Structure formats: structure tokens, C-alpha cells
């Protein structure tokens, strides 16, 4: 696969696509987008290079896809996190597939407070982007998605952007809590073995 010819996917390319109803995706500038599976599942038929951090939670059904040429399967209660610059390709989704998604620009990621050992977490996610969440963790992700989306739709609010950014910061702290429950601890002995 010639990486030069792989289409890049960012927030603006999805919002401005003629295949997508722009009213089904809630955004702030080119920094944050929240959407559901019905919004973008069939947008691209081939591989795409991500320009954003994408977080997805499968609510129903299942899907198969690959990230950087590695195959993965996602089923109900499963979360996937695809990092900027990774190449993702949708393979197949069951007819009953439903999911919720967050997309965050690289520039916004750089402004978020640094949480714990985030670099080690990103290295872990490059190899293990999918994991199953507990019912409580699923509810937490869904609650953030619902509330942030509600705030995104309050277009007349004076501090809409600031409120959404604050909620996203809280969401990233919650994600770090979830990762701590699922990712193996990174210790100095592990690093010395590499």
C-alpha cells in the first residue's frame, strides 16, 4: 500500500463530505467531533489515514477493521482508540452495529493537561487499540458522550467552547482511569527488557 495515496481523514473532511449529513455530527471548529455509527460508518470504502484521535465504543453488534494492517474485532462493550497518523480500514460491520465516537484534533490534544504516563499509554494503544469495558465504564463513556454532545448543540451559549473543552478534559481523565484498569503497568524492568 502506497501511504502517499491514502486519503487523510480529519474532522473537516468528514463534516464537509457529500456522503454525510452534517446535522448528524456535532463539532467545535476543527477540534472536536462527536457522532454515532450511522453518521460515518460507510464514509470511506478503503484505508484512511487519521488526522485525529478517534475513540469509539460499540453499543450493539460487531465490526471488523484493521489499524496499520492489523485486524481487530469490536463487539458490544468494546472500545477502540485509533491514534493520529494510523491507517484504519473498515472491513465489515453487522447490520445491527451501533456505536458512539469522539474525534479530537492533534492540536487540541497538545493543549490538554498531561495525565500520568500518557506517552507510555499511547505506545500501548499503538499495539492494543481494542479492549472490553465493564458495564460501569461503558455507562461513564456514554454519559460523557451524551452530555458533551448536548453542550455542542447549545450553539447560542457564550462559553460553549470552553465548557466542551472542560468536559473533554474530564473525559480524558476518566479514560486514564479506564486504561489503568486494563493496561498492564509499565515498569522500569519492562523497559530494560526491550
Residue ranges of predicted features:
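Amphipathic, well-ordered alpha-helical segments in soluble domains
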Residues: 54-57, 140-147, 167, 171-174
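Short acidic-glycine-tyrosine-enriched beta hairpin
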Residues: 69-81
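A hydrophobic/aromatic-rich effector-binding and dimerization subdomain
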Residues: 2-8, 14-25, 91-153, 181
Amino acid at each position: 500500500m502506497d501511504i502517499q495515496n491514502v486519503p487523510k481523514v480529519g474532522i473537516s473532511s468528514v463534516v464537509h463530505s457529500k456522503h454525510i449529513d452534517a446535522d448528524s455530527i456535532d463539532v467545535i471548529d476543527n477540534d472536536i467531533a462527536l457522532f454515532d455509527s450511522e453518521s460515518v460508518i460507510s464514509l470511506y470504502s478503503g484505508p484512511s489515514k487519521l488526522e485525529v484521535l478517534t475513540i469509539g465504543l460499540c453499543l450493539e453488534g460487531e465490526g471488523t477493521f484493521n489499524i496499520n494492517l492489523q485486524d481487530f474485532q469490536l463487539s458490544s462493550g468494546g472500545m477502540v482508540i485509533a491514534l493520529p497518523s494510523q491507517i484504519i480500514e473498515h472491513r465489515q460491520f453487522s447490520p445491527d452495529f451501533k456505536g458512539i465516537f469522539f474525534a479530537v484534533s492533534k492540536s487540541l490534544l497538545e493543549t490538554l493537561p498531561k495525565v500520568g504516563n500518557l506517552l507510555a499509554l499511547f505506545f500501548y494503544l499503538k499495539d492494543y487499540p481494542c479492549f472490553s469495558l465493564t458495564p460501569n465504564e461503558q455507562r461513564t463513556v456514554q454519559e460523557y458522550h451524551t452530555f458533551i454532545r448536548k453542550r455542542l448543540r447549545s450553539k447560542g451559549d457564550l462559553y460553549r467552547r470552553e465548557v466542551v473543552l472542560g468536559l473533554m478534559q474530564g473525559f480524558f481523565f476518566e479514560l486514564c482511569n479506564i486504561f489503568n484498569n486494563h493496561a498492564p503497568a509499565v515498569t522500569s524492568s519492562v523497559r530494560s527488557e526491550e
